[in-house]
Design a protein with these regions (language model features):
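12-transmembrane solute porter fold
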Residues: 10, 14-23, 31-33, 89, ...
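Structural signature of transmembrane alpha-helices in multi-pass secondary transporters
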Residues: 24, 55, 59, 139-147, ...
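Extracellular/periplasmic helix-loop-helix junction of adjacent transmembrane segments
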Residues: 34-59
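Interfacial helix-cap and linker-helix signal at transmembrane-aqueous boundaries
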Residues: 38-39, 69-70, 156-161, 295-296, ...
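Loop-to-transmembrane helix entry
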Residues: 45-54, 230, 301-313
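Central cavity-lining transmembrane alpha-helices of secondary-active solute carriers
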Residues: 53-67, 311-320
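Helix-loop-helix hairpins in multi-pass membrane proteins, especially solute transporters
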Residues: 63-202
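Hydrophobic transmembrane-helix bundles of small-molecule transporters
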Residues: 160-275
Length: 371
């Protein structure tokens, strides 16, 4: 199975996708690298995890909506909407006077992230079909460039200027993406898309409430209220009830408009993808959110050193990911490589939990030698 022919339209779309994934990949790394400086400036250390949790809620909700909204808005309009939200959220983050405003800005960014990420994945599938792995390779490189270069730059900005410049960097990236999108990418919809104007409103509401309850327990439990308290019990029961109502709604509604078609749970492939994505998300959160924070807060490193360590990890992740992706596309054995990925993620999490300090010390040693 050869490499697909790249027409001018595909090249423009792939270039746009490269910049888009660079934009959405940079946010987490800028926040985590500048985390200690942000907390020292704005306070609210106990709410550090909420910055990422609230974004996760809005990403999850937006991704569930995107399949329906993109049918109505078109590809370019969906991307433009997401970029404008991302632009606004980063301006808000750059000028945030307190932690509350920063949390709100990350919630907004999650909305933009969800629109952008879903639209990029849909466009690549439509352009490349069975050879979409080559399109994903381009997006992986975009993630890699963002993950390798941004932590170093963010650390340098924090030490020499202010953490707020990291957000202005994201604003500049959004402007570049918007200019490329408006000038080069036509808006289009697919002929086979449904003309139904119905939305799964109940499913959206129940899913938001269920996810919010879960995040509330995990973010504030043991901090704002005790784990074994009435507040925790009420939140847990609320989350369970909302989740049950969500599943019942999705089972009874027309599966063509459901945001979570229950029939998908019968697919072993989709369930395997969900498990793999969960493992990858846990691993990525540990690597890119908490390791830079841990290095600065507990190990006493500088923001630049934490950024350098993150860049080393990101470089290795990108290289091995690209090799596996190319091998998977050529072999067309997706399930085998998916299993390899899940096992690798699990092993990585165990190694991080056991050897976190020695691992980081090795990264710092390389950083010191390079300096």
């Amino acid at each position: 199975m050869g490499v697909p022919e790249l027409s001018r339209a595909k090249m423009i779309t792939l270039t746009l996708c490269f910049f888009l994934v660079f934009f959405i990949a940079s946010d987490t790394l800028i926040l985590s690298t500048a985390s200690v400086s942000i907390l020292n400036d704005l306070g609210g250390q106990q709410h550090y995890s909420l910055i990422f949790s609230i974004r996760g809620i809005t990403i999850a909700v937006t991704c569930m909506l995107c399949g329906r909204l993109i049918d109505r808005m078109g590809r370019r309009n969906m991307l433009l909407f997401g970029l404008l939200i991302g632009l606004l959220s980063n301006v808000l983050g750059a000028t945030a006077p307190n932690m509350l405003v920063l949390v709100v800005s990350r919630a907004l960014y999650g909305l933009g992230y969800g629109f952008i990420n879903a639209a990029v994945m849909i466009m690549i599938n439509e352009l490349f079909g069975k050879k979409s792995g080559y399109g994903y390779l381009i997006t992986l490189i975009g993630y890699g460039v963002g993950n390798v270069g941004v932590p170093l730059l963010a650390g340098w900005l924090v030490e020499n200027y202010t953490w707020r410049w990291g957000f202005w960097l994201l604003v500049a990236s959004a402007v570049v993406c918007i200019a490329l999108l408006v000038s080069s990418c036509p808006n289009y919809t697919m002929l086979q898309e449904s003309n139904s104007k119905k939305l799964d409103v109940k499913g959206i509401i129940y899913s938001v409430l269920a996810i919010s309850g879960l995040v509330g327990v995990l973010s504030f439990g043991g901090k704002s209220f005790a784990w074994l308290s009435l507040t925790t019990l009420v939140l847990v029961l609320f989350t369970i009830v909302m989740f049950v109502l969500f599943i019942r709604t999705e089972k009874n509604i027309d599966q063509n408009i459901a945001i979570f078609p229950v029939s998908m749970m019968r697919s072993k492939v989709l369930m395997g993808c969900a498990i793999g994505q969960f493992c990858m998300s846990v691993n990525s959160t540990c690597l890119y959110v908490y390791i830079p924070y841990y290095m600065q807060q507990e190990m006493g490193t500088t923001a630049t050193q934490a950024g350098a360590a993150t860049s080393i990890i990101s470089f290795m992740t990108t290289v091995f990911g690209a090799i596996l992706l190319v091998a998977m596309v050529k072999a067309q054995r997706h399930s085998v490589f998916g299993l390899i990925t899940v096992v690798g993620e699990a092993i990585a999490l165990v190694l991080i939990s056991i050897f976190i300090s020695p691992t980081l010390s090795v990264c710092l040693l390389y950083t010191s030698d390079a300096a």
